[in-house]
């Protein structure tokens, strides 16, 4: 857009705004209300009433928030996980009907050994049918452990001593070893140092925001250099305010930091 068109639009806008508020009654009423509020002297009771009402409203809002959170928790019940009871191993002593393939222990009772009858000629019974053979239990020989020193080999009772293989620790390739391992190589990852965030406490030269550039407290950066268009519009508004000054209108008092003290 052309700069002249922008200037014309600004002039028209100012004339319309000044014409609509020429009577000044709405502005006067508003300023009067503000002045009466500022001049009013509040008593201690009014202050206490105001503080109590604010605290009451704060507590009510807080209770509402707590109720909302409680309702959300009630709608989503937590599922309780109960641990399964551990059943003891069943011993099959002959009275139970249930059979367990893995945990059943059979109780074997030894048969009573009856003494062998000796036929001394006085008995009528023949020894062919009623002779009881004395069965002597075989001595239980310990199982032979084939440790390499014995020459005898046992097919059934030989227990092979299996020594566990020593677990070799995984090699960490730190650059000093020549051997490379495809599967057991562990890469040593060093965490990156965390740099603390810089806090702008006012001593730094970097501006905190764009508003710092436009503040007039810094005489090194004049406003008309930073933004010439803004400077021209500001001066134009001041001139139009003085030209249109009447008894019904108020002088345009801009904030202090809008004025350029360096000029």
UniProtKB/Swiss-Prot annotation:
Residues 1-21 form the signal peptide. Sequence repeats lie at residues 81-107, 108-134, 135-161, 162-188, 189-206. Keywords: Repeat, Signal. Residues 95-104, 122-131, 149-158, 176-185 have a biased composition (Basic and acidic residues). This antigen is recognized by sera from infected human. Isoforms are highly similar and contain variable numbers of identical direct tandem repeats of 81 bases. Residues 70-207 are annotated as: Disordered. Residues 78-90 have a biased composition (Low complexity). This is Antigen 10-3. Residues 81-189 are annotated as: 5 X 27 AA tandem repeats. The keyword Acyltransferase does not apply. It comes from Schistosoma mansoni (Blood fluke). It comes from the Eukaryota.
């Amino acid at each position: 857009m052309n700069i002249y068109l922008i200037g014309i639009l600004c002039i028209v806008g100012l004339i319309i705004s000044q014409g609509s508020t020429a009577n000044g009654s709405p502005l006067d009423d508003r300023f009067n209300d503000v002045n009466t509020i500022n001049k009013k002297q509040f008593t201690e009771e009014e202050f206490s009433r105001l503080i109590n009402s604010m605290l009451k409203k704060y507590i009510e809002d807080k209770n509402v928030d707590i109720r909302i959170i409680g309702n959300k928790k009630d709608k989503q019940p937590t599922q309780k996980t109960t641990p399964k009871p551990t059943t003891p191993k069943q011993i099959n002593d002959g009275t139970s009907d249930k059979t367990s393939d893995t945990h059943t222990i059979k109780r074997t009772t030894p048969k009573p050994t009856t003494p062998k009858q000796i036929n001394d000629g006085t008995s009528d019974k023949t020894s062919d049918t009623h002779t009881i053979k004395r069965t002597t239990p075989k001595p239980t020989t310990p199982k032979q452990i084939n440790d390499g020193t014995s020459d005898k080999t046992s097919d059934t009772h030989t227990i092979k001593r299996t020594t566990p293989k020593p677990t070799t620790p995984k090699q960490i390739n730190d650059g000093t070893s020549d051997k490379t391992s495809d599967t057991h190589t562990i890469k040593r990852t060093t965490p990156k140092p965390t740099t603390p965030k810089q806090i702008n406490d006012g001593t730094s030269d970097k501006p905190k925001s764009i508003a710092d550039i436009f503040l007039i407290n810094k005489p090194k950066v004049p406003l008309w250099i930073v933004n010439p268009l803004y400077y021209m519009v500001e001066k134009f508004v001041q001139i139009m305010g003085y030209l249109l000054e009447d008894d019904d209108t108020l002088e345009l008092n801009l904030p202090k930091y809008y004025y350029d003290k360096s000029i």
